[in-house]
From Swiss-Prot:
Source organism (scientific name): Microcystis aeruginosa (strain NIES-843 / IAM M-2473)
Annotated coiled-coil segments of the chain: none
GO molecular function annotation: tRNA (guanine(37)-N1)-methyltransferase activity
The protein's name in its UniProt record: tRNA (guanine-N(1)-)-methyltransferase
Pfam families: tRNA_m1G_MT
UniProt gene name: trmD
CDD domains tied to this protein: TrmD-like (cd18080)
Length: 231
Protein backbone atom coordinates (compact mmCIF):
# COMPACT_ATOMS: atom_id res chain seq x y z
CA UNK A 1 0.00 0.00 0.00
CA UNK A 2 1.34 3.40 -1.02
CA UNK A 3 0.33 6.44 1.04
CA UNK A 4 1.08 9.86 -0.47
CA UNK A 5 0.45 12.66 2.01
CA UNK A 6 -0.06 16.20 0.73
CA UNK A 7 0.75 18.38 3.72
CA UNK A 8 2.05 21.73 4.90
CA UNK A 9 3.72 20.05 7.88
CA UNK A 10 5.68 16.91 6.90
CA UNK A 11 7.43 16.85 10.28
CA UNK A 12 4.07 16.16 11.94
CA UNK A 13 4.34 12.53 10.82
CA UNK A 14 7.93 11.86 11.89
CA UNK A 15 7.39 10.41 15.36
CA UNK A 16 4.21 8.38 14.68
CA UNK A 17 5.76 6.73 11.63
CA UNK A 18 8.82 5.72 13.64
CA UNK A 19 6.88 4.03 16.43
CA UNK A 20 5.05 0.75 17.04
CA UNK A 21 3.38 -1.35 14.36
CA UNK A 22 3.50 1.46 11.80
CA UNK A 23 7.28 1.57 11.96
CA UNK A 24 7.49 -2.21 11.60
CA UNK A 25 5.10 -2.21 8.64
CA UNK A 26 7.20 0.43 6.89
CA UNK A 27 10.42 -1.48 7.60
CA UNK A 28 8.91 -4.63 6.07
CA UNK A 29 7.63 -2.68 3.06
CA UNK A 30 4.06 -3.70 3.88
CA UNK A 31 3.23 -0.01 3.52
CA UNK A 32 5.09 2.99 2.12
CA UNK A 33 4.60 6.63 3.06
CA UNK A 34 5.62 9.52 0.83
CA UNK A 35 5.40 12.96 2.45
CA UNK A 36 4.81 15.76 -0.06
CA UNK A 37 5.34 19.34 1.11
CA UNK A 38 2.63 21.43 -0.55
CA UNK A 39 4.85 24.53 -0.42
CA UNK A 40 7.25 22.88 -2.87
CA UNK A 41 4.58 23.53 -5.50
CA UNK A 42 4.09 27.22 -4.77
CA UNK A 43 5.35 29.62 -7.44
CA UNK A 44 6.14 32.81 -5.55
CA UNK A 45 9.14 33.69 -3.41
CA UNK A 46 7.08 33.43 -0.22
CA UNK A 47 5.96 29.86 -1.10
CA UNK A 48 2.37 30.90 -0.55
CA UNK A 49 -0.31 28.24 -0.99
CA UNK A 50 -3.37 30.07 0.37
CA UNK A 51 -5.44 33.11 -0.59
CA UNK A 52 -8.59 35.02 0.36
CA UNK A 53 -11.98 33.57 -0.68
CA UNK A 54 -13.98 35.25 -3.43
CA UNK A 55 -17.09 36.92 -2.06
CA UNK A 56 -15.42 37.68 1.25
CA UNK A 57 -15.44 35.72 4.45
CA UNK A 58 -13.25 34.85 7.39
CA UNK A 59 -9.92 33.10 6.92
CA UNK A 60 -7.98 31.78 3.97
CA UNK A 61 -8.38 28.91 1.51
CA UNK A 62 -5.79 26.55 0.06
CA UNK A 63 -5.26 27.44 -3.60
CA UNK A 64 -6.00 24.83 -6.29
CA UNK A 65 -2.76 25.08 -8.30
CA UNK A 66 -0.31 23.68 -5.72
CA UNK A 67 -2.64 20.80 -4.82
CA UNK A 68 -3.22 19.78 -8.44
CA UNK A 69 0.47 20.03 -9.28
CA UNK A 70 1.51 18.09 -6.18
CA UNK A 71 -0.78 15.19 -7.04
CA UNK A 72 0.06 15.30 -10.76
CA UNK A 73 3.72 14.89 -9.81
CA UNK A 74 3.05 11.51 -8.18
CA UNK A 75 3.43 8.10 -9.75
CA UNK A 76 0.00 6.59 -10.43
CA UNK A 77 -0.58 3.19 -8.80
CA UNK A 78 -4.14 2.15 -9.68
CA UNK A 79 -6.54 1.49 -8.17
CA UNK A 80 -6.12 4.63 -6.10
CA UNK A 81 -8.24 7.02 -4.07
CA UNK A 82 -7.64 10.75 -3.60
CA UNK A 83 -8.97 11.67 -0.18
CA UNK A 84 -9.52 15.12 1.30
CA UNK A 85 -9.55 15.41 5.09
CA UNK A 86 -12.45 17.77 5.87
CA UNK A 87 -15.21 18.16 8.50
CA UNK A 88 -17.67 18.14 5.57
CA UNK A 89 -16.73 14.60 4.54
CA UNK A 90 -18.37 11.28 5.30
CA UNK A 91 -17.49 9.85 8.73
CA UNK A 92 -14.54 7.47 8.71
CA UNK A 93 -15.63 3.92 9.58
CA UNK A 94 -14.14 0.45 9.74
CA UNK A 95 -15.81 -0.79 6.56
CA UNK A 96 -14.14 1.98 4.56
CA UNK A 97 -10.73 1.15 6.05
CA UNK A 98 -11.25 -2.49 5.05
CA UNK A 99 -12.20 -1.47 1.51
CA UNK A 100 -9.06 0.60 1.14
CA UNK A 101 -6.85 -2.11 2.63
CA UNK A 102 -8.34 -4.83 0.45
CA UNK A 103 -9.00 -3.12 -2.87
CA UNK A 104 -6.60 -0.20 -3.32
CA UNK A 105 -2.88 0.14 -4.04
CA UNK A 106 -2.55 3.87 -3.40
CA UNK A 107 -4.16 6.40 -1.09
CA UNK A 108 -3.41 10.08 -1.67
CA UNK A 109 -4.39 12.03 1.43
CA UNK A 110 -4.81 15.81 1.21
CA UNK A 111 -4.48 17.48 4.60
CA UNK A 112 -6.79 20.48 4.75
CA UNK A 113 -5.92 23.72 6.56
CA UNK A 114 -7.29 27.18 7.27
CA UNK A 115 -10.94 27.45 6.15
CA UNK A 116 -10.62 24.61 3.65
CA UNK A 117 -9.67 24.25 -0.01
CA UNK A 118 -10.83 25.78 -3.27
CA UNK A 119 -13.99 23.89 -4.28
CA UNK A 120 -12.49 23.03 -7.67
CA UNK A 121 -10.17 20.63 -5.88
CA UNK A 122 -13.22 18.78 -4.52
CA UNK A 123 -15.10 18.84 -7.82
CA UNK A 124 -12.34 17.83 -10.23
CA UNK A 125 -9.60 16.04 -8.27
CA UNK A 126 -10.76 14.48 -5.00
CA UNK A 127 -12.56 11.13 -5.20
CA UNK A 128 -13.71 11.04 -1.57
CA UNK A 129 -14.04 13.49 1.33
CA UNK A 130 -13.58 12.04 4.82
CA UNK A 131 -14.08 13.32 8.37
CA UNK A 132 -13.17 11.83 11.75
CA UNK A 133 -16.51 12.99 13.14
CA UNK A 134 -18.71 15.95 13.93
CA UNK A 135 -15.97 18.21 15.26
CA UNK A 136 -13.29 20.50 13.83
CA UNK A 137 -9.52 20.12 14.20
CA UNK A 138 -6.76 22.62 13.42
CA UNK A 139 -5.35 20.51 10.61
CA UNK A 140 -5.95 17.51 8.36
CA UNK A 141 -2.79 15.72 9.45
CA UNK A 142 -4.50 14.10 12.44
CA UNK A 143 -7.24 12.35 10.42
CA UNK A 144 -4.68 11.46 7.73
CA UNK A 145 -2.58 9.72 10.37
CA UNK A 146 -5.68 7.91 11.62
CA UNK A 147 -6.29 6.58 8.10
CA UNK A 148 -2.68 5.46 7.68
CA UNK A 149 -2.85 3.64 11.01
CA UNK A 150 -6.29 2.15 10.44
CA UNK A 151 -5.53 0.85 6.94
CA UNK A 152 -2.00 -0.39 7.64
CA UNK A 153 -3.03 -2.55 10.59
CA UNK A 154 -5.43 -4.39 8.25
CA UNK A 155 -2.72 -5.21 5.70
CA UNK A 156 -1.45 -8.81 5.84
CA UNK A 157 1.67 -9.12 7.98
CA UNK A 158 1.17 -6.00 10.11
CA UNK A 159 -0.65 -7.51 13.07
CA UNK A 160 0.99 -10.62 14.53
CA UNK A 161 -2.22 -12.57 15.12
CA UNK A 162 -4.61 -12.00 12.23
CA UNK A 163 -7.35 -13.69 14.25
CA UNK A 164 -7.37 -10.72 16.64
CA UNK A 165 -8.63 -8.50 13.81
CA UNK A 166 -11.74 -10.66 13.47
CA UNK A 167 -12.65 -10.37 17.15
CA UNK A 168 -12.42 -6.61 17.68
CA UNK A 169 -15.08 -3.91 17.70
CA UNK A 170 -17.16 -3.40 14.52
CA UNK A 171 -16.02 -6.60 12.79
CA UNK A 172 -19.27 -8.40 13.69
CA UNK A 173 -21.32 -5.21 13.65
CA UNK A 174 -21.04 -4.92 17.44
CA UNK A 175 -18.71 -3.31 19.95
CA UNK A 176 -16.05 -5.43 21.62
CA UNK A 177 -16.67 -7.26 24.89
CA UNK A 178 -14.89 -6.24 28.15
CA UNK A 179 -11.57 -7.95 28.83
CA UNK A 180 -9.56 -8.60 31.99
CA UNK A 181 -6.07 -9.75 32.94
CA UNK A 182 -4.21 -10.55 36.19
CA UNK A 183 -4.63 -10.07 39.11
CA UNK A 184 -8.00 -11.80 39.56
CA UNK A 185 -8.91 -9.31 42.31
CA UNK A 186 -7.73 -5.69 42.28
CA UNK A 187 -8.78 -3.31 45.06
CA UNK A 188 -11.76 -5.52 45.71
CA UNK A 189 -12.88 -5.59 42.05
CA UNK A 190 -13.11 -9.15 40.81
CA UNK A 191 -12.75 -10.59 37.35
CA UNK A 192 -16.11 -12.13 36.31
CA UNK A 193 -15.97 -15.77 37.49
CA UNK A 194 -17.12 -17.12 34.12
CA UNK A 195 -13.85 -15.97 32.52
CA UNK A 196 -11.89 -18.13 34.96
CA UNK A 197 -14.20 -21.13 34.71
CA UNK A 198 -12.42 -22.83 31.82
CA UNK A 199 -15.75 -23.49 30.09
CA UNK A 200 -15.20 -22.17 26.59
CA UNK A 201 -18.86 -22.20 25.58
CA UNK A 202 -19.91 -20.29 28.71
CA UNK A 203 -17.14 -17.77 28.06
CA UNK A 204 -18.21 -17.34 24.43
CA UNK A 205 -21.85 -16.88 25.47
CA UNK A 206 -20.91 -14.33 28.13
CA UNK A 207 -18.78 -12.35 25.72
CA UNK A 208 -21.48 -12.30 23.06
CA UNK A 209 -24.07 -11.08 25.56
CA UNK A 210 -21.67 -8.37 26.70
CA UNK A 211 -21.25 -7.24 23.10
CA UNK A 212 -25.00 -7.00 22.70
CA UNK A 213 -25.50 -5.10 25.95
CA UNK A 214 -22.58 -2.74 25.39
CA UNK A 215 -23.56 -1.88 21.82
CA UNK A 216 -27.20 -1.28 22.74
CA UNK A 217 -26.20 1.00 25.63
CA UNK A 218 -23.32 2.94 24.10
CA UNK A 219 -24.04 3.03 20.36
CA UNK A 220 -27.76 2.87 19.63
CA UNK A 221 -27.01 3.80 16.01
CA UNK A 222 -24.86 0.70 15.52
CA UNK A 223 -27.32 -1.39 17.51
CA UNK A 224 -30.20 -0.41 15.25
CA UNK A 225 -28.18 -1.17 12.13
CA UNK A 226 -27.20 -4.56 13.56
CA UNK A 227 -30.84 -5.39 14.33
CA UNK A 228 -31.86 -4.53 10.78
CA UNK A 229 -29.18 -6.81 9.38
CA UNK A 230 -30.51 -9.73 11.43
CA UNK A 231 -33.89 -9.63 9.68
Amino acid sequence: MQFDIITLFPDFFTSPLQSGLLAKALERDIARVNLVNLRDFAHDKHRRVDDEPYGGGVGMLLKPEPIFEAIESLEILPPREIVLMTPQGEPLHQALLKTWAGSYQQLILICGHYEGVDERVCEHLVTREVSLGDFVLTCGEIPALAIINGVTRLLPGTVGKAESLKLESFEAGLLDYPQYTRPPVFRGWQVPPVLRSGNHQDIADWRYQQQLDRTKERRPDIWQKWLEEQD
